[in-house]
A protein has these predicted regions:
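Contiguous beta-strand/loop segments that form the cofactor/metal-binding neighborhood of enzyme cores
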Residues: 196-300, 332-341
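C-terminal helix-rich "cap/oligomerization" subdomain common to oxidoreductases
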Residues: 2-4, 32, 56, 79-81, ...
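Predominantly a Rossmann-like dinucleotide-binding segment in NAD(P)-dependent oxidoreductases
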Residues: 16, 136-241, 367
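Short acidic low-complexity segments
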Residues: 63-73
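Residues that mark the start of a beta-strand
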Residues: 4-8, 156-159, 290
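Core-facing hydrophobic residues within beta-strands of well-ordered domains
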Residues: 35-37, 59, 77, 157, ...
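Beta-strand-loop-alpha-helix segment that lines the small-molecule cofactor/substrate pocket
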Residues: 79, 85-138, 152
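N-terminal Rossmann-like dinucleotide-binding module
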Residues: 1-58
Length: 372
């Protein structure tokens, strides 16, 4: 048996995304015998010590750091994961790359196409392996759909349409925002409705249907300001300006010639349990039939986290077996297969997804059709 990969995580505190989604699959079987968490880093020494204490075991003492340089230079680590807010991606990931460590980085892997290209170039020049938190392709349902399309179950794809919604109250990109999430409402921070839900969807979309050819887009800011609220929903009294769109609509064509129509909606108040307000509905029409993907989960627009479970093919419901794994866990499993063997996103692939998003921004800003 090979030795487990020695892992450090930047941004792993006692709560938050890394502690609830990224790391848990690594702490139990089957992955716990292949990965070993040895170090954490946060900007606050106190929180770093608390996190290290939480993840230490009887056999392993997790080290606490509070700078990216210190954890990246730890000789006892093979790979370092960066799980911090988007504006801090480049600063932290660059330190890991410079130290010659393999890198996991959360999507969107930097602000805009320029920063993602920068990281991809640095990683390639250094010769390190990378894995990016674009996990939607790991979904058992999406893999099933990909197989159905490739096997010609619905014939040649003619068109595809998707609508998704993120309901209130206090969800991102709406009239109110939880304290600590204000950065999502500034477009230049690279964590918009298009960057996050959109980017993850395009990962599944292109994985199943192939590359996009042309795009025409509309992005609208319908809430010029947002009221900041506490975790319990009470207002803090602060109101911040918003330049991040709450509505993004995209039409265009695939390289195959199929027509696409996609619409992301946020800041909505219609209850998520109202059928007319289905959080995710994706239809793929072909010459021999259609595929319908649906989810009633309130946050189904975040396809990387909340896998759709309802699938119909030519009007018949198809059940997809639940293996009990998460998309994050499946991605970590793929990484173990080695360079070029595992089916997971890396920084070079992230550039391709970011190029789609960049084309949408350019189309929406200029009111023009953009070719990819």
């Amino acid at each position: 048996m090979t030795e487990p990969l020695r892992l450090g995580v930047i941004g792993l505190s006692t709560k938050g995304w890394a502690s609830t989604h990224l790391v848990p699959p690594l702490l139990g079987p089957p992955l716990s015998s292949h990965y070993k968490l040895l170090a954490v880093s946060t900007t606050n020494p106190t929180s770093a010590e608390a996190s290290a204490a939480k993840y230490s075991t009887a056999n392993t003492t997790v080290k606490a750091y509070h700078t990216p340089e210190s954890i990246a230079s730890d000789p006892d680590l093979d790979i370092v994961a960066v799980s911090v807010k988007t504006p801090n991606h480049v600063e932290n990931a660059t330190k890991v790359i410079e130290a010659g460590k393999d890198l996991f980085i959360e999507w969107p892997a930097g602000r805009g196409l320029k920063e993602t290209k920068l990281l991809a170039g640095l990683a390639k020049a250094k010769g390190i392996r990378t894995i990016v938190g674009l996990q939607a392709r790991q979904s058992a349902l999406f893999r099933k759909v990909k197989k159905l399309v490739e096997e010609g179950k619905i014939g040649d794809v003619l068109s595809t349409s998707m609508t998704s919604r993120i309901p209130g109250p206090h969800a991102p990109w709406g009239p109110t925002v939880f304290k600590g999430s204000e950065y999502l409402l500034k477009k230049d921070n690279g964590a918009t409705l298009l960057d996050i839900p959109g980017g993850h969807f395009f990962e599944a979309f292109t994985y199943i249907l192939g590359p996009i050819d042309t795009i025409s887009a509309t992005a609208v800011v319908q809430h010029a300001s947002s009221q900041v609220v506490n975790p319990d929903g009470t207002p803090t009294g602060e109101v911040i300006p918003v330049d991040s769109p709450s509505q993004v609509a995209v039409s265009g064509t695939l390289k195959s010639g199929a027509v696409i129509s996609l619409h992301w909606r946020a800041g909505l108040e219609t209850p998520s349990n109202v059928k007319a307000a289905t959080p995710l509905l994706w239809v793929i029409d072909g010459t021999k039939g259609s595929i319908r993907i649906e989810s009633d989960h309130p946050l189904a627009a975040l396809v990387e986290m909340y896998e759709p479970t309802q699938l119909w093919v030519n009007g018949e419901e198809v059940k997809v077996e639940d293996d009990g794994k998460t998309n994050e866990g499946r991605a970590w499993e793929e990484y173990l297969k080695g360079e070029g063997a595992g089916d997971h996103a890396d920084l070079q692939h992230a550039v391709k997804i970011k190029s789609i998003i960049d084309a949408i921004w350019r189309s929406a800003k200029g009111g023009v059709k953009v070719s990819l």
